[in-house]
Amino acid sequence: LTVKTVATTGSLKDAAGNAMTSFDIGTNLAAQSGKTIVVETTRPTVLNITSTKNNGTYGVGEDINVRVTFSEAVTLSGAGAKISVPLETGDNDATVEINSVSNSATADGIYTVLEGHTTDGSDLTAKSKPTLVGTLKDHPAGNEIVDAGLDIPGGQNLADTKNIKIDAVYPTITNVTSTTADGTYKIGDDINLTLSFSEELTLANGTLDVTLNHGNTDNAKQSINAFTDKSSITGTYTVAVNDTSNNLDHTSIALGGSGTLKDGGGNQPQSWAPTNQTLGQNKNIKIDGNRPKVLKIRSSKPAGFYKVGDVIPIQIYFTEAVSTTAANILKATLETGSTNTDAVVTFGAIDNSGIATQDYTVRTNDLNPALTVNSIAVSGGQRVNDQAGNEMTDKSIPTGKNLADEIVDIYVDGVLPVDDGTAITMTTKGGNVVADKYN
C-alpha cells in the first residue's frame, strides 16, 4: 500500500502558528520496513470447466478428471464443504464432488462412468454451474466467491474445452432377419443373414458366429468376419447336403476365436439374444438339403409265373415326391436272363409324385425266377428333382429293397417249349387210344 498524495482543504499550522506549505511525502508507507500492505477486493470467479483426460469415448468404469479453473488461487473451508459439478450423462446424471481445495486456482474431482451413462454422441458437459457448500475464498485476501462467481463463462464449459464422449450403455443385438424371400431353398442356395445392433459396433480379432437350426452340425455355424463401426451386418448361409429346417432360425449367437464386439466406449453386449425378434420370427424360410433317393422297388403283381406277353408294372418308390425335367428320361434295367439283352423300362414324365410306375411286358426268351432291377439311370443330361429342386444324384437301390426282396418269386419265363426231335414211346394203360394225339 502506497500513499499517493497528501493535501488539505484548509490550513495546517504548528503550535507557533506556522502554516505547512509542503505536502511532499518523505518516506512513503510502502518504503517502511515491515509495512507491505496489499489491498485486494476482487472476488474470485470460475474461468472454465475442463479435464486432464485425453479426448475420446469412454465406457463403464472409466475414471475421468473434471477440473474447475478459478480466476485466482482459492481455499475451500467449512463443515462438509464441497464443490459439486453436475454432468449431463443421460437419464441418470452424474455429479462430481470436490472436497478439498487449498490455495490453488484449480479444483479437481473424478467422475467414474457408470452403466447407463451416455452423452448420446455429444461431448461431456456440465449440466449447470457448480454449487458450493461451505466457503471458497481467495488467498491471501480472503475475498469470498459469491453465487454469480460460479457461473461458467460462455464457451468455457467442459464440452467447449474438451471432446470427451460417454458411452456406458451396453449394446444389444436388436434383430435377426434376412433379405431373402420366404420360401423353400435347396442345396447350394444362398440365404442372407442380417443382424442389427442398438448402435455402431466393431468386431475385431475373431468372428461373430450364428448357429442355425437346420440339424447339420457340419454346416450349422455361419461366421461373420471382422467389421468396423456397423449398426448392422450381413452374412451368407449356403444350404448344404443334409441341412433341413421347416422354419430357419438361429439357436445361438457368439464370438468365435479371440473376437471382441464393442461399441465406441468399449462396451460389449451382455446378452446375445435379440431384443426384438429372431430370424424364425421375422421370416418363413424352409431348408431342404436332402436329395431324393430310391426307397424301394415293387410291383402291383403278386408272386407267380409270368409268360410272354404278360404285363408286370414296375414301381420305383422315392424317399420324397419328385419331378422329372423331361419325359422318358428315367430308366430301369431289369435282369431278364442271359439269352436276351436286359429289358429297359422307360418311365414317362413324373410330376410331384413319390412313385413312378411303368409296365414291363415279358418278351420271348426273357427268363428270371426272381425278377429284379439291375440299375436305375437318368438319360439325356436331364434330372430327377425333389420339390425344392434338389437333384437325385444317387440312383442306387438300397440293399434288401429290390423287387426280388419286396415281392419274392415273380418268375418270368418267356422261353417257349420246342420239339427237339426226340422219339417218344408211349404205352397204353387202358381206355381208348386216339390216333395222332397224346393219350
What positions do the PLM features span?
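Non-catalytic beta-sheet/beta-sandwich ligand-binding modules that flank or precede catalytic cores
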Residues: 1-439
